[in-house]
Amino acid sequence: MKSRFSIPEFCLSHWLLRIPLAIVFLQQGLSKLPFSLEDAEAFDLPGLVWWFVIYGEIGAGIGLLVGGIMTKPWLPILERCYIPDIGDAITRFSGITICSIMTGVIWVGQPDSLMDVILYDNLHVFLWVGGLVFALRGNRLT
């Protein structure tokens, strides 16, 4: 006997993780502009590292959104040149960038132990895990 009810498929549920993560990284990156060496020195970082952090955060936020949009050819003109793997690669690279930045943030905090990170630095751990999800799964979260 066939059931009348079935579990709905939530094929767009990846946006529930993608949008907040992108907003956090865009907001953090844009709040660091304009670039200044004084801000870098406040965290004992070289200027070049600070520059990569700023543009890495902005790029990762934009990359998560663009990579998600590129899952389908939304415009008819894009159907001829549509390559789904490009959106997946952008999403994965953005996830790797997020993991790298969050590893640096946790490292700069100089925690005493791994338990201190897990118990008291949970926001950064959650952001790191969110980046790890997109780095490992890309656009294939469904």
Residue ranges and their predicted role:
Residues 38-47:
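Perimembrane loop-to-helix junctions flanking transmembrane segments
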